[in-house]
Regions:
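Short active-site oxyanion
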Residues: 1-2, 32-35, 69-71, 116-121
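Short, well-structured N-terminal submotif of metal-dependent ribonuclease cores
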Residues: 1-41, 47-65
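Acidic, PIN/NYN-like endoribonuclease modules and their adjacent C-terminal/linker elements
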Residues: 3, 112-149
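Alpha-helix capping/helix-boundary segments
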Residues: 10, 41, 79, 111, ...
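General small-molecule cofactor/ligand-binding pocket signal
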Residues: 36, 73, 140-142
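Phosphate- and divalent-cation-binding pockets in alpha/beta enzyme and binding domains
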Residues: 44, 82, 132-133
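Cytochrome P450 catalytic domain signature, combining two hallmark sequence patches
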Residues: 52-57, 91-92, 140-142
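Active-site neighborhoods of divalent-metal-dependent phosphate/nucleic-acid chemistry enzymes
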Residues: 71-121, 125
């Protein structure tokens, strides 16, 4: 069975739209036994939550179920190595300017490599950045929300 990891943009879209929230909830219910949370995504979500009440809700409703079920993944040493190699390749081949690189892109590299190691499909609406990363290493991704096989 395929494993899945949701990108932060899935949770953010769900927090801004009832329709997106319903789509995410349906996918989570169907894929629960195959769904993992990256600590990279958890950090992005926590950093973007400004009000204490919202942070408590994020912890309780979104993050806690993954931690409780042991479905949390961390970037490995190899993921950090891949981050450095990917950035170096993009500097050399695309003219990437590191000081102007958004943190979110750095996080995307760590997330993509972590999914590769887990053998999981990364669910994200951010295909543009992931196409750039795919020039350096392969990983599976899909737009929200794929059919389950």
């Amino acid at each position: 069975m395929r494993k899945f990891v949701l990108d932060a943009n899935c949770f953010i879209a769900a927090s801004r739209s009832d329709d997106e929230a319903a789509l995410l909830e349906m996918f989570v219910q169907r894929a629960a036994s195959r769904l993992y949370l990256s600590t990279v995504v958890a950090a992005e979500l926590r950093a973007g939550t400004n009000r204490i009440g919202d942070l408590r809700k994020l912890e309780k409703v979104v993050l806690k179920p993954y931690y409780k079920r042991g479905r949390v993944i961390n970037p490995s040493a190899a993921a950090w190595d891949a981050l450095g190699k990917t950035l170096a390749w993009l500097v050399k081949n695309e003219g990437l300017i590191l000081r102007m690189t958004p943190r979110s892109f750095i996080f995307d590299i760590l997330l993509a490599y972590s999914c590769r190691e887990l053998g999981a499909v990364l669910i994200s609406a951010n295909e543009r950045d992931f196409q750039r990363i795919r020039q350096v290493f392969a990983f599976d991704s899909a737009p929200p929300y794929p059919h389950l096989d």
